[in-house]
């Protein structure tokens, strides 16, 4: 659910959230994220392992990251997301903060309670 505010939020507002509070920033609006369930985490770990092993066994140059992993979708930092799994093949998109620009592939696990 987005915060009811007319203002446009920025990445600085995300950074100012209390430790442990997870949220995404989409078009300047903050969306809080519920902690993932045990089932969600288990499935995410399995999928992550399969993708990572496939990339390694095929000597791929792509890198795979599991959430929390920052993806900044625009240069103005009005959109910041944390996909469950991100695959990035262009090393120029990666820096110490995470990924700037769209990953080559993402996996988002949606549970019935997310709807």
What is the predicted function of each stretch?
Residues 1-115:
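Gly/Pro/Ser/Thr-rich low-complexity, intrinsically disordered segments predominantly at protein N-termini
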């Amino acid at each position: 659910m987005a915060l009811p505010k007319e203002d446009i939020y920025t990445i600085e507002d995300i950074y100012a959230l209390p430790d442990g509070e997870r949220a995404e920033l989409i078009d300047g609006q903050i969306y809080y994220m519920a902690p993932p369930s045990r089932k969600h985490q288990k499935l995410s770990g399995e999928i992550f392992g399969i993708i990572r092993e496939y990339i390694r066994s095929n000597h791929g140059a792509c890198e795979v990251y599991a959430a929390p992993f920052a993806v900044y979708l625009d240069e103005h930092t009005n959109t910041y997301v944390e996909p469950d799994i991100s695959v990035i093949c262009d090393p120029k998109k990666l820096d110490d903060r995470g990924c700037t620009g769209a990953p080559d592939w993402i996996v988002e696990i949606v549970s019935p309670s997310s709807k």
